[in-house]
Each structure stands twice: as structure tokens, then as C-alpha cells.
Amino acid sequence: IFLIFLPITMWIDTHTHFDAPAFDVSRSRDWLRARERGVVAQVIPAVAPFNFATVREVAHAHEGSFYALGIHPMYVMTVVREMPRETAIAALRAAIESALPDERFVALGEIGLDGFVADLDWDTQVWFLREQLKLAREFDLPVLLHVRRAVDPVGKYLRELGIKNGIAHAFNGSDVQADVFVKMGLHLGFGGTLTYERSRQIRRLAARVPLESIVIETDAPDIPPSWLSAGEANYSYHLPRIAQVLAQVRGISEVDLSVALWRNTLNAMPRLRAILPEV
């Protein structure tokens, strides 16, 4: 039974690498602090086979925590140095099949393409993305997408393989690209970058994208909001303050935003409904 105290506002961090070593010293305390601030749930995506078990264990050890399984584009070169790429996909398939009965398992991710890091072989990234999208289609799972400087090619493969549900995490595309993803049925994730006044394009997107297509995230320990020092780790307990900025950008109350984002997140990852209540 999932029991939570529902504050005036409640938030779901749709993307946090809560299994990262940065949290090892005070993980439980940090999550308690987040929950005290109204962050009642979080989704922890895997990045490669080496942390498939870890994200599952961390999710089960912390109330309100869920996980996704996938191979991150920034890890594909490491993976292929350790094993044949077909073996990696087979490991992911096996992990998904094992996780399907688990109510804490909610998505396939983090997957996608990265057009920023120079030494990531593009063809290898594409191969892993396509193979993982096939798994998402086969198992009817939403995808948590990494789209840094790669919105158009990711969209191409989503259309090719008929993927219509998921989240474009840390979205930073153009208005046209946002419209394309929204029309495909995807949700767009906004986080710490939104808090910088110089982030005019992201703020414009956050203001104009249909409210029902938005979710919120921290990407902790990365993408620190504006009030943190350079290099300082991000935490899920900063999510309510990020949400406050988003509410201001949208021109709506934090309560209305909270309700909308909760519903959006459950629509983006329907398996959450096995534990989280509707609002």
C-alpha cells in the first residue's frame, strides 16, 4: 500500500539519477528532505547494464521511487568496449522482462542521441536507439529521451518505429521542434535551466507549450538551478523551487501547476498509476 501525505502542492521528479555516487553519503536523508518539501515521487533512469540492478535497488529502498531501464547514448561507447552490442541489448531485454511484474518499473530509459559530445560514434548511437525503441514498442513502454542537439534525428526514429509516448528530457529545441514532439504525443521535460533569466528560449517554450504536454525534473545531480554554485550537486528537494519558476513563467498558481504536472506525468508513464493516486 502506498501511503502519502498530500500537501497543498505535490511534485514528481520525472528524471533524477538518484543512484549516482554523489548521493551515497546522505541518500535517505536527501530523499526525506525532498518529500518534506512535497516531492512525493521520483523516477530514476538507468544509463547502462552496469546500473540496471542499482536503480531497481535504490527505487525499492526509498518510498515513492520508481525506475526505468535503458542504455544512455553517452555510455554506448563504454558498453561496446565491454561487450558486443547485441549482448547489451539482450541484457536490457532480460532486465525488462524481469522487471515487468515490478510496480516500481515504469519506463525505458534513458535512451536517445547526443549531438554535443564529439567522441560518441553517431552510427553506434543510432543503432542502440533504434534497438531500444523496438523494445519500447514490443513491451508497450514509454521512453525517457536524451535529445541534446539531436531533437530532429530522435524524432525521425520515433516516427519510424511508431513511438507515441514518453518524455523528451531537458528539452531545449526550437518552437517548431517542440510542436512536432507534442503532436507525436510526447511530453517535454523542464528543469533547472529554466531558472536562469538568460534561458529565454526555454522560458518561451515553457510558456507556450500546451500545459498538458509539460513535466518537471531535476536531472539530479546535474543541471543545477540558478541558486546553486557552479559545480554544486543538484538534488530533488530543489524541484518545488524550480516549479515555482515554471508557475511564474506560465502565469498560473503553483497549486494548479502541481495538479496539471501530476496528471501529465501519470499520462506519460501510465505504470505509475499502479501505486500513485489520481488527482
Which residue stretches match the model-derived regions?
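Mid-domain alpha/beta scaffold segments of enzyme catalytic cores
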Residues: 2-279
